Each structure stands twice: as structure tokens, then as C-alpha cells.
Amino acid sequence: MAYTTLLRCTLVAAALSAGKAFASPTTAAPQAKTTTSVDQAYRESLTYFFDRPATSMMEALPLGNGRLGMLSDGGVQHQRITLNESSMWSGSVDSTAWNAEAYKQLPAIRKLLLAGRAKEAEDLIYRTFVCGGVGSGRGQGANTPYGSYQVGGFLHLNWDKAPELSGYYRGLSLSEGVSKESLVVDGQAYRTKRLYSVLGREVQVVHLTNHSEEARRDTLRLSLSRPENGHPAAEAGFLTLSGQLPEGKGGRGMSYAIVVRPVLPQGGTLITRGDELLVVNAPTVELYIAHNTNYYDKRLPVMARSIEQTLQAKAVGEANLFAEHVQRFTAQMDRVQARFLGSDPARSSLPIQRRLIAYYEHPERDPALAALYMQLGRYLLLSSTRPGALPPNLQGIWTETIQAPWNGDYHLNINLQMNYWPAEKGALPETVGALTDWVESIVPSGERTARTFYRAKGWVTHVLGNVWQFTAPGEHPSWGATNTSAAWLCEHLYNHYRYSQDRAYLQRIYPVMQGAARFFLTTLVKDPKSGYLVNVPTTSPENSYYTPQGKAVAVAAGSTMDNQILRELFSTTREAAMALGRDRTFVDSLSTALRQLKPTTLGPDGRIMEWMEDYKEVEPHHRHVSHLYGLFPGSEITPHGTPELAEGAKKTLIARGSSSTSWSMGWKVNFHARLGDAEGAYEVLNMLLRPVDAIDPKTNKPYGSGTEPNLFSSHPPFQIDGNFGGSSGIMEMLLSSETGCIIPLPALPKAWKAGSIQGLRVIGNATCSLSWSAGELDRLVLEAHHAYRHTLLLPGEGRGYVLRLNGRPLDTKTLLHQGRLHLPQMQAGDRLEVVKKA
């Protein structure tokens, strides 16, 4: 970029900024009113650290503000900071994905499957009923229309000298969303940094202090780089990196620009040399980093906007930005506080890589690490999405590659949904805004897919999702034929309503739910053998079975997961319509279809059947346990309501095995928690927290799956869904409400002998706090934020507890029905207190 071009962008940015404060965007998450004081010692307990620089991304510490992300390796002489932005995607809308001839083969496919000729049907699907074009490129789609999430670029901080250190620290505060780095020479501070992605703003910040004369004299060289499609420059006191990503059809697609504005508030010299900026003799250096794409607005002048944002940040000042960021971040993280007592005090002083190893050897000595891991899930969600941005992808917002694993996309047969499991109960409901926006954005494409492939009404999507509204089947039926993803996504939207009781939101999402339900009302077919309505073709995600002829196939006429999801979709859509007083005829159609779906069924061995018939699975220990959707995240299987199915679910989990990919283990923690199996949940959680390089005694090789040194979950490779699944599982072990009843401590393991958790949300728009000791509930407080009648399940039917509503005692005998306490209607502001009798 020529100097005059950058100067012109600077002038444009200055004009844009003239007379305008650096206001938070309208899409920033609303701030919570924190009613519970939080001591600094607790916030410090939500910190983990390394005692050395990172040797890979899996040792870097993640920062984010919901759109912008940052990973620093904390290098001593050579430091690399990875920069990410959630819309940084190659690719473009792919009109070839809609296979115009596919619908012609659908009758033949259905006929073959219903006749038991599954192998022939699968072959026919592969030839005729997959997406047009190359689809996702089998997970290597960076240069295809499907595209890939990509790294933005790298900010390099290079010094001339490598000091001889006597101390090193690199830590992350989950409470504040701040990473701090410290170099010590001869026992004295040499250089410190703090890094953060400003919540509610559009910049990231690196604040560097040189504490000694030697550190100040050491020249700092700043530069930006990118493996491809990036043009670095250093002009007029700015570092810039700009370019266009491939759109997958031979042309150039999305434009982006990264701008770094160094500021030397205490003096020093800034020198331009080639595409570097040199900082000489500066006590303090402030780096303001902005990163924009034209994904949301093709006309956006991305360079001018990025320059504008750095100028505005400079005008506000780093100290003010830092204070504002910490206030906003802690306000949201403080909503939920978890204290698991009984840890060895020495554990928290260990560098995280050593603490993980110590936990693997003796987890009972560090319950606090489980509490930290639960909060990490909330932290990663808050950092990787926000209203007005995009949902977290398979890697959240953090990647260092051009070709992200599996394109860093939105896998819709569990992975994107799992990302949101901690959102509602973890008191971060604002994060669901991005999911709602994204789901609404793919509905028109899903309607076209419904028409093109199925000649059906409504809308549908399959396994693959990206930022370009891809909704067609995947390129292979063994995994790409699953078509209940839209229905599953709708359940997340409806769950937001269940938690918030926001009628305006329900009115907004009802057409989305209705469209998803309408698709299946027009595509389900009657199975001539059983008489039930079945979804044909489908799969049980990514798993295969043996036909009676001994052939291994994936596609089927109906699956248990489909039936469970559709039963939930039809039920909740009916509830929504009735709550809104809408579509009586449509409601009747849903009721009729519900009666014709096959119930969840036990096989001869007592396990939950995965398909309509009792087939033998090809992989008995498969990572997906899709036929237990009705246990979690669904709620049709419960120990109290369906004890036989709950027992069948236990047998299914035993047969499937515990050790697996990280996200699968995260899912299984939730399964065991829903079953009330405390020790089972704890065992799988500890497997999830297993260091990835721990040796598997069966193979004498590293497990690979588990937890990376920086606490990212590993499939392998890194997939963020395991973090979110594990976080949700810990919450489910302590409190459950999604089955229609508030259950405190449903799966409390013996190792968590005493502790407390405050601020978890429950269905009906209320928050719940509780404490326990000796493995028993001591106290529970339920605070209502909306009119709702709650049901409570207490040990011994509540006989050992005193209940007070707004200070007035309640008679548990009059509230008890079928083992549960049906509480009086609570209004916003009401407070229920449950205290164990002395």
C-alpha cells in the first residue's frame, strides 16, 4: 500500500470519528446487575498460568470479545500473537450445491430402504442425492466455494536481545478476560505485558511496560504477516495487513484489513523500516489492534474502518479501556460463582501443565480444577460469540491456519449445538443472540434445499453449516444424509424462551420452528412394517450398522435420534403455537403426527435401540451416542419418569464405553448427570481432563483425546465443543431443571465433599444458588425474575428442610405430589429459601 493510500484511509477514518465518541456497538451484550459481591481471592482462583513460553497453539492463552480473538505465545525474544476475527472465511455462496436432479431419485431411495435394501439405497444416494459440486471438500474446503474459517494474521514482537531470566509468568484470568505476562531478570521486573480483547468494543490491546533501562534500550520490532493473501505494510505510524480471500470459484472473495497502532505515552521513538515499525527507548508501549472484514457489508471500507477504530481507542486511552473491559467482563463472569472446597492449596500454585498431570494422578486432591474448568466453558463462550456476530465454530474463534480442521465450520449433528449447552444455565443468555441470527439467516437456503431435494414445504438443513448458508446434504451419505439438524437447532431457540419467558422472542422464532416442523410433516412416510411415520432417508449420525445380509451401511429408514428430536420439535412447536394463540389446524397436524412416531424402545439386550430395528452396530464404541438424545439434551428419558428407559440408557452407556473424543466424553458427563450417576459422571469428567499426552496402557501410546496444556479440549485435534460439553456437564451434576423439575445436586460425586455454586439459571427465568457439605444439600435460594410456578425435587421429599417464600414458611406436606414439591406461583422479585433442618 502506498503512503498516500494509507494517508487517505487515515483521513477518512478521522472524518468518520470526528465528533463521535468511541461508543460501544449496539450489538454489545447487555450487562448484568451483579447482586452478589465477589472477593478478589475468588477471582484470582479463576486464573491459570504457565511458567514458560508456548511451544504451540495448544499452550497459548485464548482471549476474545465475541468477534475478535487473540492467542499469544508469550515469547521472550520473539513473540507471536495470533489474530482472529469470527467472519474471516474464504468461500462464497455455492449455487451448485442445490442438486437440481436429486428429488427425482427420492421415491426410489425410500422404496429401497423400506424394502430392507439399504445397501442399494445408500449406493443410489451417493450417486444422486448428495450436494452438487464438491461440498465441503471433505473438510479441506479452503479453496472451494464452501470455504474455511481462517487465521487473520500474526503480530510479531521481536527484540534484539534475549535476557537471561530468573523468572517467567504467563497467566489468564477467566474472571477479567486478561492475560498477563512477566519477565524477571535478577529478581527484578524486566518487562511486563497485559493483553485483552475489549468487551463491547472493536479493538484488542497489548500494553507493554519496560521496567529496566536495559529493557527500554532493547529495540522492539513490530510486524504483521500471513501465510497467503496478505499484504503487510508499515506507514504513517501504522502497521497494516490487508487482502482478499479466495471465493472458491477462481476469483477473489472477502476483503479484510488488520491495523495495529502503536502509541508511546511516556516517550520514545517510532521508526518505519520496510514493513516493520521499530520502537526505541520507550518505557511503555500500547498497541491498539483492529480487524475487519466486509462479510456483513460488502461496501465497507475495511482499512478505513480499522484505522478509525484504532484512533478511537487511542483517544479513549488504554487505562480507561482496560478499566471498562474488566468491569464488563467481570459483570458477566461473576453471574455464576463456583467454589469446590477441599483442594490441596499447593495445586493452584502449579503451572497449568503440571496441575493437569497432578489432577490426572489424584483428582480428589483438586476439586477446584473442576470448578475452574466449568468456568472456562463460560469464559470461552463469552469470548467467542456475542449478539450481532457469529456463533462459535468448531474452534470457537481461535485458529492459526489457513485450512482449519474440518474447515472450522458449523457441524450440525451435535457440535454447534453442544457449543451452546452452557449458555442458558450458565447465565450467558445473550450469547444465544448470534445463534438465533445465524439460524434465521439459513432459513431461505433451507427452504430452497427442501424444495430442490425433497419437493417439500418448510426448511431443512443437514450436517454441514458455514457462513455462506450451506444447507444441502453432505458429499457422502454415511454422514451427510442426516437431516434433523434444523429441528435440533430449533430446540436451542425454544430453550432460550423456556429460560427467559420472553414472549417477543417466542414470536420471533415461531416461524422458524413452524417451518422446520412443516418440512417433516410433509416428508415423513409410513413404514409398512410398523405403521409408524419414519424419516427416510436418514442416519444415526456417523454410525453404521450391519444389514441382515451382513452389509455395513449408514443410511436407514428412521432412527431413534430422529424420532426423539421430532417428538421434541412437534411438541415444542405445538406449545409455542398455543402460547401465541396461532394456527389451530397446524397444531392438530402436529398432534396427529406425534401419535404416529415410534416411541424410544429397548432392544432384547436391554439397551436403547439405535435404529427402528435391532441392528448390530459396526462400531460398538462409536463416539456418537445419538440414540440417547432423549436423555440429554432432550428430556424424555428420566430416572423418575421413565425408569425402564433410564436403565436402558445406563446399559447403552456401559456398552458404548467412556473414553472417546473430547466432545463425546463431554456429552457423556451430561448423560451420567441426568441419570443421577454421580461417580459415572465424575469418572468421565476426569477422562475429559486427562492430559492429551497421557499414555494409554492398552496401546502404550498417548491418548490424544482429552485436554491440551492450555485447557482446550482435544478431539484430537482441538475442538472447542468438548470444553462446552464438559462445562455443561459439571453444571448438570450440580443442578438440573430442563426435565421440568428443579433438582439440586442430582449427581454430586463423593470427591466434591463441600462447596457452593451461585447464579445458575433454571427454566422459568430464575436463578438458583446452593451450598452443600458432607455430600448433602445445606441451603438453596431460588430468585424469580418472571412469573412462573416451579417444581422442586428434594431429598426425602423435603422432610429434612425448611422452606420459606419471601420469609414466610411453606408447608411441604401440602405442596407434595408424586414425590415433588409443587411450589406456589412465584412473581418477579420473589425469593424462595430452602434450609436443611438442624
Describe each PLM feature range.
Residues 141-160, 720-763, 767-768, 773:
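Catalytic cores of secreted or luminal carbohydrate-active enzymes
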Residues 515, 519-576:
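Acidic/histidine-rich catalytic neighborhood
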Residues 485-496, 505-522, 664, 681, ...:
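Extended, hydrophobic alpha-helical segments in both membrane/secreted and soluble proteins
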Residues 377, 513, 566, 633, ...:
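Hydrophobic, well-ordered secondary-structure elements that form the walls
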Residues 30-477, 484, 493-497, 528, ...:
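Aromatic-residue-lined binding/catalytic grooves and analogous aromatic/hydrophobic interfacial grooves
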Residues 1-32:
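Bacterial Sec-dependent N-terminal signal peptides
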Residues 396, 400, 533-535, 543, ...:
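C-terminal catalytic domain of Rieske-type non-heme iron oxygenases
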